[in-house]
Amino acid sequence: VYILRFNEHLASLSPCDFVKEILVDGLHARWVTVGENFRFGDKRAGDIKLLEQLGKEFHFEVHPMPMLFHTHAPISSSRIRHALAEGDIPTANYMLGRPYMISGRVLHGKQLGRTLGFPTINQRILPPHSKAKPAIEGVYAVKAHGIGPRPIEGVACVGRRPTVDDHGEYLLETHLFNFHGDLYDQDVKVEFFSKIRDEKKFCSLEELRAAIADD
């Protein structure tokens, strides 16, 4: 995976400079596959026709892929993000062509879940001090992969724990059913199935405990 950081320099590249700097000099591309509505370069000036012309000049092949549709509209990253933000996991999974998952290393937490009777594995989902928001928030039915021979069902919360921390970072906290073990520093994938409810600030830990039990 080659990650391009979107910055002022990248945004200002002309279509020709984008191809020369990124595809030719950077990746030494010989075969380029893009969606049929692909646009590139400053002000989205480049299209498939121009990319094919530049491919002949710089000796790489261009293969456009046809658009895929769902409910009579093209599948796009913005539609997938919208479905995730709405908690519509089945629709997001359909457009992704795979289950939506979050993976990461299990952190040492404050043991609050254990105190409440619902121990959780905690995973950071954004870089420290990031101002970004995760693709999803709320409480979900999930399965955790990478712990044993079979996935383990559970309930996960993606949020900032407003009941106990007014300015906390976003975390993925997952309570696994019928599991007792130490997963610290292990990599775990959490697969999302359906949204149960939004994250909520409760007046007391007892109210929080009751809500978790209902979940």
Short names for language-model regions:
Residues 5:
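Contiguous, small/hydrophobic- and glycine-enriched helical/loop subdomains that border
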Residues 9-119, 203-207, 212:
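Classical nucleotidyltransferase
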Residues 58, 109-215:
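Phosphate/ribose-recognition catalytic cores of enzymes acting on nucleotide-derived substrates
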